[in-house]
């Protein structure tokens, strides 16, 4: 792709997301979503092949359907209230349709079907954009309309997402699909706490993006897309392979790694609101997610066939501008737990 064309498309995608996040008018929100959608399709299809075309088509159809539902909710709300302001959504029908549209855009269950398939069909860089940047705009709208949202629908979707995110990743050997199911589960945790403490949702999103960014950067550095290819890199780049596995355990929420912080804080916040069954169910379902990360770590590092290796091992990162942030991201993705007392200001 021509660099000028690619820069223009990327700028349009970024502008679309920024417009959604900064707008208080429903029409501008819808325009921002459409700008972002039309610009992100060529980015997903940057490596032009049949699988990328199929994945991009699935993504386009799903997001277009969600945009149609979004506009329907906006029109229904406008007919009943006469308001275009985001925060003024009082009609229950409009609220339910809006919740469904945003759930579909985020890839939450039961509209999660597109996330693993689309992520698997595109490159690692496109997958990183899909699972991080593309979550910001819908989550920002959920954050703004949290007081008037359909709570029952949102909590049901959150619980189903945590369950599906753990259950779906159990038999996967493709690392991109594993990351996709992990994303579904994390989105479930974020939406579960949204109506109780929206600020905590944003903190969870920040930690999730940081860990996902680190994982994808290491996978790109290692050129690994399957569990088999990851295990084959152990003799060549043991440091990078070890870091990938540690950060994946952090994504699973294993203490004392950074990924444990949001789960701990969310469970604590839910119990403060006299909710016992919900956090207990979430904690039990999160064990499925942690299990497949532990199994991946075990099969990759502890069940290797003993062999003599005459290759030179790479114990240092190659110098490159793209990887200059990587050491900082690795530290933050694994060692944030000592900052936990500082985060008590959210309570």
UniProtKB/Swiss-Prot annotation:
Q: What is this protein called?
A: NADH-ubiquinone oxidoreductase chain 2
Give the gene name: MT-ND2
Task: Name its species.
Answer: Rhinoceros unicornis
**Gene Ontology biological-process annotations:** mitochondrial electron transport, NADH to ubiquinone; mitochondrial respiratory chain complex I assembly
- Entry GO CC: mitochondrial inner membrane
- By its UniProt entry, which InterPro entries does this protein fall under? Complex_I_Subunit_2, NADH_DH_su2_C, NADH_UbQ_OxRdtase_chain2, ND/Mrp_TM
Q: Where are the transmembrane segments?
A: 3-23, 25-45, 59-79, 111-131, 149-169, 178-198, 201-221, 242-262, 274-294, 325-345
Where is this gene product found?
Mitochondrion inner membrane
Subunit structure of this chain's protein:
Core subunit of respiratory chain NADH dehydrogenase (Complex I) which is composed of 45 different subunits. Interacts with TMEM242.
Q: Report the Pfam families cross-referenced here.
A: NADH_dehy_S2_C (PF06444), Proton_antipo_M (PF00361)
Tell me which family the UniProt entry assigns to this protein: Belongs to the complex I subunit 2 family.
Protein origin, superkingdom: Eukaryota
EC number assigned by the record: 7.1.1.2
Q: Which keywords has UniProt assigned to this entry?
A: Electron transport, Membrane, Mitochondrion, Mitochondrion inner membrane, NAD, Respiratory chain, Translocase, Transmembrane, Transmembrane helix, Transport, Ubiquinone
């Amino acid at each position: 792709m021509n660099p000028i064309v690619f820069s223009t498309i990327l700028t349009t995608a970024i502008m679309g997301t920024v417009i959604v996040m900064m707008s208080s008018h429903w029409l501008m929100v819808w325009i921002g979503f459409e700008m972002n959608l039309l610009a992100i399709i060529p980015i997903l299809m940057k490596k032009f092949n049949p699988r990328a075309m199929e994945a991009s088509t699935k993504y386009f159809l799903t997001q277009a359907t969600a945009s149609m539902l979004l506009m329907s909710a906006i029109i229904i709300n406008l007919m009943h209230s006469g308001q275009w302001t985001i925060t003024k959504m009082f009609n229950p029908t409009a609220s339910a349709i809006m919740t469904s549209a945003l759930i579909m855009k985020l890839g939450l269950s039961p509209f999660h079907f597109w996330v693993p398939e689309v992520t698997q069909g595109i490159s690692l860089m496109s997958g990183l954009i899909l699972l991080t940047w593309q979550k910001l705009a819908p989550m920002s709208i959920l954050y703004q309309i949290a007081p008037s949202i359909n709570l029952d629908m949102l909590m049901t979707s959150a619980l189903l997402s945590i369950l599906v995110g753990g259950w779906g990743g159990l038999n996967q050997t493709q690392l991109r699909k594993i990351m996709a199911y992990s994303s579904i589960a994390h989105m479930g945790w974020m939406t579960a706490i949204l109506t109780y403490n929206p600020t905590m949702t944003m903190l969870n999103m920040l930690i999730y993006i940081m860990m996902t960014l680190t994982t994808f950067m290491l996978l790109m550095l290692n050129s690994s897309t399957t569990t088999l290819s990851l295990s084959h890199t152990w003799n060549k780049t043991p440091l990078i392979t070890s870091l990938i596995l540690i950060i994946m355990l952090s994504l699973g929420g294993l203490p004392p790694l950074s990924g444990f912080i949001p789960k701990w804080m969310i469970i604590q916040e839910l119990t403060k609101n006299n909710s016992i069954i919900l956090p207990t169910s979430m904690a039990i379902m999160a064990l499925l997610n942690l299990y497949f990360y532990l199994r991946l770590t075990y099969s990759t590092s502890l069940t290797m066939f003993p062999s003599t290796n005459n290759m030179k091992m790479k114990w240092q990162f190659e110098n490159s501008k793209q990887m200059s942030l990587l050491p900082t991201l690795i530290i933050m993705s694994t060692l944030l737990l000592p900052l936990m007392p500082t985060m008590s200001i959210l309570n």
